[in-house]
A protein has these predicted regions:
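Active-site acidic/histidine proton-transfer and metal-coordination neighborhood
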Residues: 1-58, 168-175, 183
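A residue-identity detector for tryptophan
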Residues: 15-17, 65, 109
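Short, histidine-centered active-site or binding-site loop motifs used for metal coordination
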Residues: 28, 65-67
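Short, surface-exposed loop/turn motifs that are enriched in glycine and acidic residues
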Residues: 36-40, 67-74
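Histidine-acidic metal/acid-base catalytic patches
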Residues: 55-63, 70-186
Length: 186
């Protein structure tokens, strides 16, 4: 419940963090009869709780692209969540991991940290990932990057038991290359 989150956050914020910002990452919430991965609070409840704490504490929220897509079962829900956080001036970070609506290895609408989709400039990718370069660009275009504390990636190479170190490193390196290209870094 939102009350439980508030109590937990109040306890956590009572500890000495030496000025550090405490950030929560939104996870999918239970929606109607749709199977959920985490089934936590709605983003509205999380934002409301953080706003209540914001006057006295340095707090924020991170939006994970895949987790928001899982919640909405679509690629527009991450943008909706980001816009809500921006409107409330509480967005602290963006995390990019992919998701699929039809992948055998990573599952359908599963929080398995699926890599980015195919891009002409990368060697390592997942064909069925909904996280395309276009979706990343659309996401970054609505955010003033100077106003967020960080961008990140969460990726997993599957199958776990036969993934090589080259593939694991390559997936992360290629993801950073895609982000750098979108952001204009060379």
């Amino acid at each position: 419940s939102a009350d439980s989150l508030l109590k937990s956050m109040e306890e956590i914020l009572s500890w000495d963090w030496e000025g550090s910002k405490i950030v929560i990452e939104h996870c999918d919430t239970a929606v109607d009869n749709i199977p959920f991965e985490k089934g936590f609070l709605t983003i509205e409840d999380e934002i409301k709780t953080l706003i209540e704490l914001q006057g006295m504490h340095n707090v924020g929220i991170t939006i994970n692209w895949a987790r928001s897509a899982i919640e909405g079962r679509n690629i527009t829900k991450p943008l909706e969540h980001i816009e809500l956080a921006l409107k409330s001036n509480i967005l602290s970070g963006l995390m990019f991991s992919g998701v699929s609506d039809n992948d055998i290895q990573y599952g359908s609408w599963k929080d398995t940290h699926m890599p980015f989709s195919k891009n002409e400039n990368v060697q390592f990718f997942e064909e069925n990932s909904l996280l395309t370069q276009e979706e990343i660009s659309n996401t970054l275009n609505i955010v003033d990057l100077d106003s967020v504390d960080y961008l990140g990636v969460k990726l997993l190479s599957m199958p776990i038991d036969s993934s090589t170190i080259d593939r694991r490193v390559g997936l992360n390196s290629d993801a950073v290359s895609i982000l750098n290209k979108i952001l204009g870094f060379r």
